[in-house]
Amino acid sequence: VKIHRAYRYELDPNTEQRLLLAKHAGAARFAYNWGLARWIEIYEKEGRTTNAIELHRELNRLKKTDFPWMYEVSKWAPQEALRDLEKAFQNFFRGRKTGRKVGHPKFRRKHDRRDSFRLDNSSGTIRLLLDGLDPRHPGKARHIVLPRIGAVRLKEKPIRRKKGGVV
C-alpha cells in the first residue's frame, strides 16, 4: 500500500509573487472556461465528448497565436484545470446514469469564488526549502519553490520528515 502525505501551508508572497499567483489562477480559470465552451461545442457539432488531453493539445496549438500571455504561467495550471473539467463531466454523467440530480459543469466567474489553481509535482519542480542550504536559493529557509513563481516564503515553519519514524 502506497501512502501519500499531504501538507497544507499558508504562503506569505511578496507583491510580485502575488501578481504571479493571480496570473496562474486566472490562466486556470480561463482554461477551464475555454475547455467547457469547447466541450459543449464539440458535443453539439459532432455528437461526441472529448477529454482533458485532447483539449490541452488544442489549447497548446492556440497558445502561440491567440493566447501568448499563457507562457507567463506554469504549464500545470491550465492542464490541471482541464483535468478538473474532465472530472466534473465524469461526475455529471455518472450522476445522470444513476438517476441522481447532478448539475452540468458551470463556467467559473472571476468574482464569484476564491481564485485557486493546482500544480502537479510529478516532475519534482516543487520543493520545500527547510534549512537555507539549497545551492539555487542560498539562505532561503522556510520557503517553497513553485515553477514560474520562484521561492515563496511560508507563514509557518514546515514539518520536517523524520527518517524511519512516524510524523
Set out the residue ranges of the language-model regions.
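Nucleic-acid substrate recognition interfaces
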Residues: 1-167
